[in-house]
């Protein structure tokens, strides 16, 4: 079985060795744990975003950047693909670990989740659990973790604190925008898992989404989510004829909340995240190739108007 932490650690070491080339900052804490700042006090960039996203996927995904169009506007897109959709997306990339300690708060994702089993049910349904002496975690936060935070992560992962490695980027940073858009495939796999579909039947997955502009901390969560909700396009290859029973529920347009920028929806919900229809967190359009029957299905559509409004271009 592949180890997402061992693969992620190899990429982490590459990033550390070339920190200056990627506009990131490397820190070794007093307890021996290691942190790479990808956007808190440094600019980061596309190179750092590439590493952050691939590490977040446990080294089981590839990404590329390209120029595309959102309506009449040229935008940079991120293309993502993986041959291990369930493990890379649900077992690693999913932001399934809320890391809290004193005044520190972060959404945790990446390989370390496969050691801490956060949340446990996810790993039960995909039948995966990592074994590694090192833990690599990706933190979506606006400050760097302290030694005490890294100690807590080590305890949850059952590893020595000196073997804990963290990458950190705020949502409202270039790397933050890149890595959230880089979750476009994960949202499709996540949605199918939430619907009760066996995601281990997905053979391969690929997708694309525009990288949203950095518009400040207040708008960051909404803008980054909208990139996938309204313009994420995904291709799934699977051996699962039963997918026909799930098709109409997959795309974001199946949600009651669909049709407005996320920040507008959030405001209408009284800024209570839990009042938002969970089914909204899905890609705009999905193409599925079911190989046992040879059938191809298409559901959903991109919404250029809402995307541009969210991005500040309309």
Swiss-Prot record:
Its EC number is 3.5.4.27. GO terms for biological process: methanogenesis, from carbon dioxide; one-carbon metabolic process. It catalyses: 5,10-methenyl-5,6,7,8-tetrahydromethanopterin + H2O = N(5)-formyl-5,6,7,8-tetrahydromethanopterin + H(+). It is found in: Cytoplasm. Transmembrane segments: none annotated. The keyword Metal-binding does not apply. It comes from the Archaea. One of its GO terms (cellular component) is cytoplasm. SUPFAM superfamilies: Methenyltetrahydromethanopterin cyclohydrolase. GO terms for molecular function: methenyltetrahydromethanopterin cyclohydrolase activity. Gene3D superfamilies: Methenyltetrahydromethanopterin Cyclohydrolase, Chain A, domain 1, Methenyltetrahydromethanopterin Cyclohydrolase, Chain A, domain 2. Pathway: One-carbon metabolism; methanogenesis from CO(2); 5,10-methenyl-5,6,7,8-tetrahydromethanopterin from CO(2): step 3/3. CDD domains: MCH. It holds the Pfam family MCH. Its main location: cytoplasm. The keyword Ribonucleoprotein does not apply. It is an enzyme of class 3 (hydrolase). Keywords: Cytoplasm, Hydrolase, Methanogenesis, One-carbon metabolism. Belongs to the MCH family. NCBIfam families: one_C_mch (TIGR03120). Catalyzes the reversible interconversion of 5-formyl-H(4)MPT to methenyl-H(4)MPT(+). This is Methenyltetrahydromethanopterin cyclohydrolase. It comes from Methanocorpusculum labreanum (strain ATCC 43576 / DSM 4855 / Z). The lineage of its organism: Archaea, Methanobacteriati, Methanobacteriota, Stenosarchaea group, Methanomicrobia.
